[in-house]
Amino acid sequence: MFLYEYKMERGIAMDSRVESYFEDIKGKKIAFLGIGGSNLPLAKIFRQKGAIVFACDKREKEQLGKTGEELEQMGITLKLGEHYLEQLDVDMMFRTPGMRFHTKELEQAREKGIVVTSEMEVFFDLCPCPIYAVTGSDGKTTTTTIISEFLKAAGKRIHLGG
């Protein structure tokens, strides 16, 4: 569950950076590239916050099942099929984590001044607390658990995620 959804469900006031961010995206054209698990909830939130949202995916509508219809009912425009990355007239693009950072289409978008970002990048920008990250092939869970226990023992309030 996204931090935004969690706080809204519980009536918790949002950090002013988050409020300002959502205010800034009103009326902006934002494309979500890849509409699987990660970008889908974010696209819905951005639409609710007044952005003009495009859900872009190399799959065809039939392959999306109910998801395509649900997005269209929310007022989200679908751009689907083999050429889904071509001629996107948008202000910002959110690429899915599985998408390579340096594709021809993304480089062309950057050259046009389009912001190419990801949900994690925006989270890191807006998160009001320090973030510690552990990467690698093996041992991440163990290492993360040990670090979190050290921080707890030092009296720090932590939120562990992965």
Residue spans of the language-model regions?
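Phosphate-binding loop of NTP-binding sites
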Residues: 4, 48, 85-88, 97-162
